[in-house]
């Protein structure tokens, strides 16, 4: 069985690479009392964070776009499954049973995409260089889109029935008794 040479090479490299990372890092002992947590005692005492470069901004922008694309993919798949459910719902009684499955699948896609986006925003807010307000706006937009989808599917399935009653305006000119000009009986 040929081709196994790379496995041994990868295992050797992994052993060499991880040997250093499994050991605790050596801390330099410079100045100050042992175990002091006072400011000014440490390797980075008084150091300000490095300035943000154009490359860091570009990386943050790419990370945000990739994150938004992932959400939009899940949302698109949820809309597609819901659309198939709408078509199936109109076909027949058997189609109605299948439509509920498609609506459920669409809902799972929308909920999973929205939840993963919100959790990712909270976890990656620093690397994305987002302010708290920017992250809140992003999460709010995703929540609004998800609620809009849920309302649309609920209305379509009849769970949120809206009864609209048209009441004709009575201006006093029409007679309440007898047929109208076309010979139709009065509405009841």
UniProtKB/Swiss-Prot annotation:
Q: Where in this protein does the record say Phosphoserine is found?
A: 48
Q: How does it sit in the membrane?
A: Multi-pass membrane protein
Q: Any idea which UniProt keywords this protein has?
A: Membrane, Mitochondrion, Mitochondrion inner membrane, Phosphoprotein, Transit peptide, Transmembrane, Transmembrane helix
Gene Ontology terms, cellular component aspect?
A: mitochondrial inner membrane; mitochondrion
Kindly report the protein's main subcellular placement as a broad class: mitochondrion
The record's subcellular location field reads: Mitochondrion inner membrane
Residues spanning the membrane: 102-122, 135-155
**Quick one: where's region Disordered?**
24-52, 168-188
Q: Does the keyword Transmembrane helix apply?
A: yes
Q: Transit peptide, first to last residue?
A: 1-96
InterPro entries to which the protein is assigned, alphabetical: TMEM160
Q: Which family does it belong to?
A: Belongs to the TMEM160 family.
Q: Which PANTHER family would you find in this protein's record? A: TRANSMEMBRANE PROTEIN 160
Q: What is this protein called?
A: Transmembrane protein 160
């Amino acid at each position: 069985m040929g081709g196994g040479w790379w496995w041994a090479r990868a295992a050797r490299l992994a052993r060499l690479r991880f040997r250093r990372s499994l050991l605790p890092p050596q801390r330099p002992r410079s100045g100050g009392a042992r175990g002091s947590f006072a400011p000014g005692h440490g390797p980075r005492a008084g150091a300000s964070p490095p300035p943000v470069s154009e490359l860091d901004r570009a990386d943050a922008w790419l990370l945000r776009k990739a994150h938004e694309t992932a959400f939009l993919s899940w949302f698109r798949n949820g809309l597609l499954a819901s659309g198939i459910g709408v078509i199936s719902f109109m076909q027949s009684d058997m189609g109605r049973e299948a439509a509920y499955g498609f609506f459920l699948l669409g809902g799972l896609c929308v909920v999973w995409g929205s939840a993963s986006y919100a959790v990712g925003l909270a976890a990656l807010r620093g690397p994305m260089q987002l302010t708290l307000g920017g992250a809140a706006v992003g999460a709010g937009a995703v929540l609004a889109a998800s609620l809009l989808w849920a309302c649309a599917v609920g209305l379509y399935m009849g769970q949120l029935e809206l009864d609209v009653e048209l009441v004709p305006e009575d201006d006093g000119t029409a007679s309440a008794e007898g047929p109208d000009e076309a010979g139709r009986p009065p509405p009841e």
